[in-house]
């Protein structure tokens, strides 16, 4: 039984980073404690009053209902129009990475182009999220994101960067100052972020994010 359990461990666990090949790096980036695959939750559309009070009349605007939606074409057409206006497709899954030095090494081995990260920060990166509709919202994204640790004050990002990708997608980089130390005693850290009307909140198992018994954050 012990032999079978050991055989199931991915090859990258038994090698140093320098010994990794491209396949090891890809396996690490597919499934490891630093990598989370999540389906964003979609937030409801804002009412006109909520948009006005927030100072952004375009935020969280749903589809219009047209003439049918106000009942001019009959009750059946009205119900259909309202259903279409409120229907929201399930968001596609995204990847959230805790961009430690180990993760960046894996990205290089795998031939990926990763965003530049200042070592003075913890970096959490959300990949392939729908591109925000406005390009002046980095400050807004910073105000609706944090790292949550049990019994401690939430850690807010110092900076947020929005990087345009392909096919209407974006990479969003969240930078948290390392002057607030995260330790093994924190056990689990929840990353919470809202991007437009989408919301992600994966948990990271800090105890598992170790290499040779040293935290790799």
Language-model regions: role of each:
Residues 8-217:
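PEST-like low-complexity, intrinsically disordered acidic/proline/serine-rich tracts
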Residues 2-7:
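Boundary at the C-terminal end of the N-terminal hydrophobic targeting segment
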């Amino acid at each position: 039984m012990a032999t079978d359990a050991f055989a199931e461990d991915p090859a990258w666990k038994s090698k140093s980073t320098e010994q990794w090949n491209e396949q090891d790096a890809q396996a690490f980036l597919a499934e490891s404690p630093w990598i989370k695959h999540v389906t964003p939750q979609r937030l409801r559309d804002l009412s006109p009053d909520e948009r006005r009070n927030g100072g952004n009349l375009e935020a969280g605007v749903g589809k219009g209902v047209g003439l049918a939606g106000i009942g001019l074409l009959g009750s059946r057409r009205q119900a259909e129009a309202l259903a279409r206006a409120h229907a929201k497709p399930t968001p596609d899954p995204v990847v959230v990475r805790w961009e430690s030095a180990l993760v960046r090494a894996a990205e290089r081995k795998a031939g990926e182009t990763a965003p530049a990260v200042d070592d003075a920060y913890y970096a959490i990166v959300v990949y392939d999220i729908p591109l925000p509709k406005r390009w002046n919202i980095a400050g807004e994204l910073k105000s609706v994101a944090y790292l949550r640790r049990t019994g401690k004050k939430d850690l807010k990002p110092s900076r947020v960067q929005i990087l345009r990708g392909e096919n209407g997608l974006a990479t969003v980089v969240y930078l948290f100052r390392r002057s607030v130390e995260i330790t093994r005693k924190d056990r689990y850290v929840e990353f919470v972020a809202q991007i437009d009307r989408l919301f992600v909140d994966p948990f990271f198992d800090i105890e598992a994010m170790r290499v040779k018994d040293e935290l790799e954050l």
